[in-house]
């Protein structure tokens, strides 16, 4: 679940607010008998957000199959994975931080409205605590993962009896974070703590970029900082996955038909995007 991406959910989830006349970007890859649409999604959004537009609707109607990041993101599966891979009762989180960092974590937990406050965070591994700190205030502000674009697309295509296929599994996505070295995990948590007060401003900038269909702005606001400050995280969360998905698209081009691929908008922005990875293997993705 790409909603487990860090730099806080703010940097990679690209949340969508109430918006009118939004035109998120859409790309297409074609050969003689195959059409593949690429669409960037947001994973949390308020119930009254409207992101459909005619070109997007036509692409969805024409598509026979939907690919999303994962399909096994039901609450029971996610809860089991988080319990297995995200908790660490033997090593309290505050014991892994300096005294000043632990104090800031307590303050941020209360400010973000984390249920249970520091007691809840203290039994989490650093990656899960970082994600929790990022997600809690967004959910409190009315952002709902059940209303996310990917969820809506899955429901729409399922209702039309069209296949919905996952590019990854929930465990694969969670392990992107859970398998990181502890030092990288702690760096992620410290980044989330450091940037906590900037979240509202950055979120507003990201929203505007997504609504405008501006991948350069998405990269500038939401990805460039990770690329510069957390290069290992950037490679694992974005570059390696983008490369894998480009290879998957290349294989899908060998089969006739029309396919719609919806992944987090951050994967379709920046110098290492899916489109760039496709270009490296001789495949052009054209903006619609």
Region spans (language model):
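A cross-kingdom marker for long, charged
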Residues: 232-288
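Hydrophobic alpha-helical transmembrane segments of integral membrane proteins
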Residues: 13-14
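Structured, acidic catalytic/metal-binding patches in enzyme active sites
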Residues: 23-233, 237
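Bacterial N-terminal signal peptides that target proteins for export
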Residues: 1-9
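N-terminal signal peptide c-region/cleavage motif recognized by signal peptidases
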Residues: 17-19
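Absolute protein N-terminus
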Residues: 1, 21-24
């Amino acid at each position: 679940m790409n909603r487990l991406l860090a730099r806080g959910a703010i940097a990679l989830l690209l949340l969508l607010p109430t918006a009118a006349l939004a035109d998120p970007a859409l790309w297409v890859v074609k050969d003689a008998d195959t059409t593949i649409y690429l669409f960037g999604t947001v994973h949390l959004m308020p119930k009254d957000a409207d992101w459909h537009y005619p070109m997007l609707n036509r692409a969805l109607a024409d598509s026979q199959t939907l690919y999303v990041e994962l399909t096994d993101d039901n609450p029971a599966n996610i809860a089991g994975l988080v319990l297995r891979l995200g908790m660490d009762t033997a090593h309290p989180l505050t014991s892994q931080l300096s005294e000043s960092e632990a104090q800031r974590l307590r303050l941020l937990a209360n400010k973000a409205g984390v249920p249970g406050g520091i007691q809840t965070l203290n039994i989490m591994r650093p990656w899960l605590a970082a994600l929790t700190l990022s997600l809690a205030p967004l959910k409190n502000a009315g952002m709902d993962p059940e209303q996310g674009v990917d969820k809506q697309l899955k429901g729409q295509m399922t209702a039309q009896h069209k296949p919905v296929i996952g590019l990854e599994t929930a465990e694969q996505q969670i392990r992107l974070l859970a398998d990181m070295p502890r030092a990288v995990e702690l760096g992620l948590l410290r980044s989330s703590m450091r940037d906590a007060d900037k979240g509202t401003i950055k979120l507003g900038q990201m929203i505007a970029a997504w609504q405008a269909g501006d991948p350069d702005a998405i990269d500038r606001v939401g990805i460039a900082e990770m690329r510069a400050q957390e290069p290992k995280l950037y490679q694992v969360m974005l570059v390696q996955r983008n490369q894998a998905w480009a290879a998957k698209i290349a294989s899908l081009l060998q089969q006739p038909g029309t396919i719609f691929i919806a992944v987090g908008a951050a994967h379709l922005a920046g110098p290492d995007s899916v489109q760039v990875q496709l270009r490296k293997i001789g495949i052009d993705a054209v903006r619609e």
